[in-house]
Swiss-Prot record:
Gene that encodes it: rpsS
Keywords: Ribonucleoprotein, Ribosomal protein, RNA-binding, rRNA-binding
Function noted in UniProt: Protein S19 forms a complex with S13 that binds strongly to the 16S ribosomal RNA.
Native source organism of the sequence: Bradyrhizobium sp. (strain ORS 278)
Protein name according to UniProt: Small ribosomal subunit protein uS19
UniProt GO MF annotations: rRNA binding; structural constituent of ribosome
Gene3D superfamilies (alphabetical): 30s Ribosomal Protein S19, Chain A (3.30.860.10)
PANTHER family registered for this protein in UniProt: RIBOSOMAL PROTEIN S19P FAMILY MEMBER, SMALL RIBOSOMAL SUBUNIT PROTEIN US19M
Keyword Ribosomal protein set for record: yes
Family, per entry: Belongs to the universal ribosomal protein uS19 family.
Length: 92
């Protein structure tokens, strides 16, 4: 379900503080975040965030196309190792 327009996008308050501090300092370090549910805002464009996926922080460089999406969309939590092969084909 889509969030109603009158509420506006959800962004963690601590995330806004970290992004503003990174913009003010001019440094391009990876900003570690755990808030996968936060919406990517236009002021985050050009910054790199380390989005936690349950094991490690996946670096996500934000660009214009990502605005409006959630951080969790760009940090997959599950790894697919493929289905097992056909046992009949291996024996032959």
């Amino acid at each position: 379900m889509v969030r109603s327009v009158w509420k506006g996008p959800f962004v963690e308050a601590s995330l806004l503080k970290k992004a503003d501090a990174a913009r003010a300092s001019g440094r391009h370090d990876v900003i570690k975040i755990w808030s996968r549910r936060s919406t990517i805002l236009p002021q985050f464009v050009g910054l790199t965030f380390g989005v936690y996926n349950g094991q490690k922080h996946v670096p996500v460089a934000v660009n214009e196309e990502m605005v409006g999406h959630k951080f969790g969309e760009f940090s997959p939590t599950r790894t697919f190792h493929g289905h097992s092969g056909d046992k009949k084909a291996k024996k032959a």
